[in-house]
Amino acid sequence: GFPLGVSTMSSTSLEEVLDQSDGNAWFQLYAGESDALTQGLVSRAAQAGYRTLILTADVPALAPRRRDQHNGFTVPFRLKPKQLIDFCLHPRWSLTTLMRGIPKPRNISVQEGREPSSSETGFRREAGRGRFDWRFLSQLRSQWPHQLVLKGVMSPEDAKMAVTAGVEAVYVSNHGGRQL
């Protein structure tokens, strides 16, 4: 079957998703703002049993997200009149979310066994941007013993360099074109 791609920003922990996928999941890594955070995520993925890691390199800089701006979406979330109207127009979703709690990224907490803090749930969108380079990929390759995929390759030259650096596959992507 097809593997599940599990994002660093997933609202379900990488361990839980792997359990539910019968072991057929790949972990998609966004480089964190610190090496410790990134290495912790890589170690957790390996310990959980992931056999494929996707390093996401197709968002080196953030572009304005016009749709999010138009809809009043902010991180961290702030309640505004437009959102209040949306909640009233979608009562089932609103009540379910209230009962279950606001979805939070479950993979970015560095300490096991605690809820992500409010700053972590906001996950600074600029964190880790521009940190990726070939040295970073080389270090990751030496840390990760299984299949490594580089996501965000846009040129034949970069694809060749990625293979030389030890990745098993390249994933041609511009992140939906919204980061251009």
How would you name each of these model-derived features?
Residues G1-T164, E168-A169, G176-Q179:
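Active-site entrance/lid segments in N-terminal catalytic domains of soluble metabolic enzymes
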